[in-house]
Amino acid sequence: MSKLLMIGTGPVAIQLANICYLKSDYEIDMVGRASTSEKSKRLYQAYKKEKQFEVKIQNEAHQHLEGKFEINRLYKDVKNVKGEYETVVMACTADAYYDTLQQLSLETLQSVKHVILISPTFGSQMIVEQFMSKFSQDIEVISFSTYLGDTRIVDKEAPNHVLTTGVKKKLYMGSTHSNSTMCQRISALAEQLKIQLEVVESPLHAETRNSSLYVHPPLFMNDFSLKAIFEGTDVPVYVYKLFPEGPITMTLIREMRLMWKEMMAILQAFRVPSVNLLQFMVKENYPVRPETLDEGDIEHFEILPDILQEYLLYVRYTAILIDPFSQPDENGHYFDFSAVPFKQVYKNEQDVVQIPRMPSEDYYRTAMIQHIGKMLGIKTPMIDQFLTRYEASCQAYKDMHQDQQLSSQFNTNLFEGDKALVTKFLEINRTLS
């Protein structure tokens, strides 16, 4: 029986482990980071006590994803992992891939044939493939565009029980190996699970099919949003609302378009198909009513004049201020879809100040895009500006709160190891035009 190592013990890892348990013949081991994370420690203790994981579903249409199961072994920490594994599934955040893999033993690393990246960012495959190439010349790296849905913990005292509240309309997947048997197996599995999965020609291609890459930096790395996150506000403000209730202005939309254009220049250098941003938002993320946007404008978005592109993006955000497909109440009010409050910096269980995942994960993603652009000789002034703003907010917080214990997220010289691997990969693989 082949062995699979699931790296991560959060809701995503539990849902994926359940799928593997139900639909594959893998012997499943999981590993967390119980010595450094209170959440991971709670999960470890809960599983050891109950000897069981459980996945529940919110929508009956997804009942094939639910179940109770146990695994072969749950490791406390990565450094405790022993033995050989054919497949490693990275169910942790993309910024942890390199740091986590390098903690595995030489025996384990040399045994791995496939590494599957569940929530990668642009460039993740380069990092993982370059690192793993030291241990195996024929390593297969598979990238998904994003995780298959939304899974969360309902009760933090029972973190081994999770709830999947939704499933994405469509996923993309790409492998470093053409005619990959593993990809064929995953495609067959997706069909069984009624998940639309498109296999694309490379992991890099799959990594570009995630709208967060294009919309999170402008939404979170502007003065309005950064103030809400790092300083707080007198009244609640919301991520997806128009100014003054939220950050969305024509300036923000212009910056979104400029970043998208910079990304498209990078994609062109790799000969990766471009992303029609409006079409991706409307057809694969949150739909709008057909009366709102013209199909021709959506289809030809990439070739329209700049000002019209910005107008259409702005219209799209106004169209999802409410859920246009919800039922209005007796007063004619629709569900307030855009009322997603900003999360502020917070103290964890160890009294260390943390930056929320949005924008700390977006900082990593955007920094990697900037580095790849730099390696290709492509100028990215808008991306540079997003990063400068974010770093200035981190520094200002450090200056104002010297008495507090701050997490390493507040440092700005991060990701040097990841960047070095990208540089090496690009030097070796001259796949550019």
UniProtKB/Swiss-Prot annotation:
Documented EC number(s): 1.5.1.52
Gene3D superfamilies: NAD(P)-binding Rossmann-like Domain (3.40.50.720)
EC category name: oxidoreductase
Superkingdom assignment: Bacteria
Stimuli inducing this protein: Up-regulated in metal-poor media.
Keyword check for tRNA processing: no
Signal peptide as annotated in the record: none
Pfam families: Staph_opine_DH
Catalytic activity: staphylopine + NADP(+) + H2O = (2S)-2-amino-4-{[(1R)-1-carboxy-2-(1H-imidazol-4-yl)ethyl]amino}butanoate + pyruvate + NADPH + H(+)
A GO molecular-function descriptor: oxidoreductase activity
Catalytic residue positions: 216 (proton donor/acceptor)
Chain residues that bind NADP(+): 9-12, 33, 37-40, 99
Assigned keywords, A-Z: NADP, Oxidoreductase
Subunit record text: Homodimer.
Family designation: Belongs to the staphylopine dehydrogenase family.
Annotated NCBIfam families: staphylopine_DH (NF033600)
Task performed by this protein: Catalyzes the NADPH-dependent reductive condensation of pyruvate to the intermediate formed by the adjacently encoded enzyme CntL, namely (2S)-2-amino-4-{[(1R)-1-carboxy-2-(1H-imidazol-4-yl)ethyl]amino}butanoate, leading to the production of staphylopine. This is the last step in the biosynthesis of the metallophore staphylopine, which is involved in the acquisition of nickel, cobalt, zinc, copper, and iron, and thus enables bacterial growth inside the host, where metal access is limited. Therefore, this enzyme probably contributes to staphylococcal virulence.
Descriptive protein name: Staphylopine synthase
Organism: Staphylococcus aureus (strain Mu50 / ATCC 700699)
Upper taxonomic lineage: Bacteria, Bacillati, Bacillota, Bacilli, Bacillales
